[in-house]
Amino acid sequence: MSIRVGIVGISGFGGGEAMRLIAGHPAFEPVYAAGEGSAGQRLSERFPGVPAKLADLVIEKWDPSRLPQLDVLFASLPTGASRDALARIPREVKIVDIGGDHRYADGWTYGLADVWPEAIAGKTRIANPGCFPAAALTALAPLLADRLIAPENIVIDAKTGISGAGRGGGAGFGYAESNENLIPYGLLKHVHMPEIESTIARISGGSAAGLVFTPHLVPMTRGILATIYARGRATSDQCLDAARSFYAGRAFVRVTDKPPQTKWATGSNLAFVSYAADPDRNLVIALGVVDNLGKGAAGQAVQNANLMCGLPETAGLEGAPVWP
């Protein structure tokens, strides 16, 4: 039985990555695609490498009142563009919002799939985590759950590829400006700070007061490395053991005793975490790596949709990362 799937926001990087993954999914059948920047084009015009069976699917202008019969809808729209529109979709259509409009909304479940998979199964409205929270929280969750670190005064220093700025980019993100350059942005006010703070508090049962989060754009296409500093008396081995126990049986989180690299996750839904600790200095360093378009966006969205539909969560996501 095929599950009829639609994608809104296919013109952007997140929507395009969702289409790439869904095109090879064993149960999902893409029957609808919408994108403001590519309406009227055949899918093969926008994505020349799309499988032949999808080549003639025409990208439509997004209109929530004119959807075909769907089982699942992936929405990859800019912040502020989806709240009213998605409220018009019938409840029987399962929705995964890859954008940021529903992460705190009533009636929506936060889809941090490797931490709370049981909360996602059977739901019809899932808010996908942001890309930076996906990297940072995957690394922090085991330590917070086991009380190995304090939830207060955590410092997150994160690096992301230029695709993290979106396909629209903007001033300062062109090749000449981003090549051989390192660009900090969103200091003290990044949109992902409240999401990280609230989830730290939820996992720890405490407060995330004093969180510092500074993201940087680096001259690579995709990938996130979050280097996180926290207070705690645990050893490195205790942190690694906690993560291995926490993620036992989880298909997509790899715990490594070597510092992870962004290349390890490229093109996949994998997350890599590692830890180094100095109890004498009351210091724990946690490292989290994801592909910002994979686990940080479309990959986790497909994982969430699998859980919603009662499918194996690995369906359509078992491909190895791209190397080199």
Curated annotation (Swiss-Prot):
Pathway annotation: Amino-acid biosynthesis; L-arginine biosynthesis; N(2)-acetyl-L-ornithine from L-glutamate: step 3/4
Matching InterPro entries: AGPR_type-1, NAD(P)-bd_dom_sf, NAGSA_dehydrogenase, Semialdehyde_DH_NAD-bd
Enzyme class: oxidoreductase
E.C. number(s) listed in UniProt: 1.2.1.38
CDD domains: AGPR_1_actinobacAGPR_like
Sorted UniProt keywords: Amino-acid biosynthesis, Arginine biosynthesis, Cytoplasm, NADP, Oxidoreductase
S-S bonds: none
GO cellular component: cytoplasm
Function: Catalyzes the NADPH-dependent reduction of N-acetyl-5-glutamyl phosphate to yield N-acetyl-L-glutamate 5-semialdehyde.
Protein known as: N-acetyl-gamma-glutamyl-phosphate reductase
Organism: Bradyrhizobium sp. (strain ORS 278)
Gene: argC
